[in-house]
Amino acid sequence: GFFEKAAFYGGTALRIFHGLQRFSEDLDFSLLEVKPGFSLEPYLKGIEKEFSALGVTVSIEEKYKTAATNVDSAFLKPDTAWKELIIKEILPHESVKMRPGLKIKIEIDKTPPLGFTTEERLLLKPFSFYVKCFTLPDLFAGKMHALLFRKWKGRVKGRDWFDMEWYIRKKIPLNLEHLLIRSLDSGDWKEKSMTKEQFMSLFQNKIQLKLFN
């Protein structure tokens, strides 16, 4: 199945499985190994079939991201699969809380920065099944990478600070090794290692920039 090859991560994973009180527009997945030739196509009919069983008609469209429009997804790479699921029609059903025209962006990193660990999390609604997810320390590392290096109109997105505070309040440890790998992968860090002191220096500099901008 799909979760033998990929894991769920990002803000939506944090909301669904860990109770983050913030909505997210994307479904972000990472392959468990680098595989540039991976395709979502074999899974699309299954997605449409599951929605159809709930009385929901959907279409899944291929989307392309160019450098000129690379704003919202600052770390979306050319080898990231990007699909957009569009809710077309819904039959009345008390368990279906969606509206026609709703769009859900699905991203899959086919050449992911590795060094992360995963765990199986149980999803209860609308059906019970297990989902392979990044562990919290690795999710935290991904969020800190976004906060430190995200290039969005020269600013950090407010959601990054909101999420960071959530991790700190929950006393989630940061996987510094995974943060290092992500930073090397994005080209934002050039050294072979990253100490806690170096990380804190980056973090404090980002806070200072936030305070004065």
Tell what function each PLM region has.
Residues 1-6, 17-20, 32-213:
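Structured mid-to-C-terminal alpha-helical surface segments
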